[in-house]
A protein has these predicted regions:
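Short histidine/acidic/glycine/proline-rich micro-motifs that form metal-
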Residues: 12, 55, 125-127
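Flexible, gly/pro- and Lys/Arg-enriched active-site loops
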Residues: 31-33, 41-50, 63-67, 71-161
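Amphipathic, positively biased hydrophobic alpha-helical segments used for protein targeting
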Residues: 17-19, 53, 128
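N-terminal beta1-alpha1 ligand-phosphate binding loop
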Residues: 1-27, 32-39
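Short beta-strand-to-loop capping motifs
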Residues: 9, 54-60, 95-98
């Protein structure tokens, strides 16, 4: 099963926390975006995030993949205090090829992916032909507010950080 994961962190050693996800999926990564510095989304009175997108081929079911991401978040001691608040690690399933779900535990595609520069810009960098709900990710990036696009800063590939 091919899945698109958006990963992010804005607490502690952000690079090392993202690296744990890269390491966990090392043998299953088909493509990876550079790491980007991004402003917080939703709740803006918090530190800047580091974000990246991984495209992975995995054997597990969507729910098993969700649990795998949650285990990584738990290992990073993520505490869910405030919706869209600071976090040590966030592992979101953005899309799964050939799969949709409106289960409140796992919405696929991710219900906010189409409006989040911190998801779309890294995803486009990882896969120039990416599509979300039938529309090209490049088109969705072009439709973002130019100010929002400008706030996303490429830092480099994970192995360079």
């Amino acid at each position: 099963m091919r899945a698109v994961l958006s990963i992010g962190s804005n607490m502690d050693d952000r690079v090392e926390l993202l690296r744990t996800v890269f390491d966990e999926f090392a043998g299953e990564i088909v493509a990876a975006s550079p790491v980007y510095a991004t402003p917080p989304w939703g709740v803006t009175d918090q530190d800047e995030f580091l974000n990246a997108v991984l495209i992975v081929d995995v054997e597990e079911t969507p729910k098993e993949l969700l649990r795998r991401g949650q285990k990584l978040e738990e290992a990073a001691e993520r505490v869910r205090v405030r919706h869209w608040g600071p976090r040590t690690l966030d592992v979101d399933i953005v899309d799964i090829e050939g799969y949709t779900s409106d289960d409140p535990e796992l919405f696929v595609p991710h219900p906010y992916a189409h409006e989040r520069a911190f998801v779309l810009i890294p995803w486009l960098a990882a896969d120039a032909g990416a599509r979300l709900s039938g529309e090209g990710v490049a088109k969705r990036v072009a439709a973002l507010d130019p100010k929002e696009r400008a706030e996303i800063r490429r830092l480099g590939m994970m192995e360079e950080l």
